[in-house]
Amino acid sequence: MKKAMKRLLAATSAGAVLCGSLALSSLLGSSTTLTASAATDSVADQTKVGTLGIAGGGFVSGIITGKNVMYARTDVGGAYKYNYDTGNWDQMLDDLNDSERGFLSVDAMCIDPTDDDTIYLLCGCAYFSDAKTEIFRSRDGGKTFDRIDVTDLIQVHGNGEGRQFGEAISVDPDNPNIIYCGGDVASGDSALIMSKDGGDTWEAVKGYDDLGLFKNSIKWPTWTEHMARALTDAEYYHQNGVSIVHVQDGKVYVGTTIQGENSLVVADVGSDDFQPLSKDLPTNSYPSRINVDADGNLLISYCGSITFSGGGALYK
């Protein structure tokens, strides 16, 4: 049951159920169209589907799985770890005080692929806690956290539009000291940052900024004089910036909430040379999640809107 439930939740977090019918297209040329009902029937043959209780917590915007663990994030209610013994989700951020409630908006999270107990949470809310953005790092499965303030580099609004999109932070499986992370807006030299020391320090990835995507100056949030660079001139809660980051096999993949060929780009880890991943990918919708199947293939989901509407597609 544990493995079956993990398969179901992993499929959910890949964006398969968020986008209606799924158009599964191979970048190698072949394609298959799957209906939502066919996918449901396939899963139903292998799993028992029920509900899991979370005692409070807002909209569950993402679920990630490791080898033997599951974590969930919410838009205003913190982050949780699933307890297989009790069948409950245990809150990991319940020690935050009222002045820190902005960090209960968890915009993205990831697990170190080499260690289920090492997790990273990208936290921030534009209208609480002085609009600060921090990365929470735990090396003991969420029992305790170190906190790294990255507000001067990027900022996120974990309760904004697009919060259901996938994880904008990723650890390099080949070198877990290398981590990439993306923001909704850039408050420094790039909306994409990286760490080379396991999250202790962070720096701007200027090659991503050279794509020229974040060229609008907006107030963050609206009623302040603090300025940030954004994809559009819309207000802060409409900004979704970097939607996904994924590191795999020496490559870093970065999805951005824009239309056009630069909505999904790739570079070698450590390189500043970002290029469009493929001309065969959609240019009229937004990359929402990236996952990897059992054979190591990339699964990329797209959504037609950063709100809760629009069609979608899944590419392999």
Describe each region flagged by the PLM.
Residues M1-T12:
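Bacterial Sec-dependent N-terminal signal peptides
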Residues M5, L18-G20, L27-S30, L34-K316:
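Extracellular glycan-interacting surfaces
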Residues A11-L22:
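Sec-dependent N-terminal signal peptides
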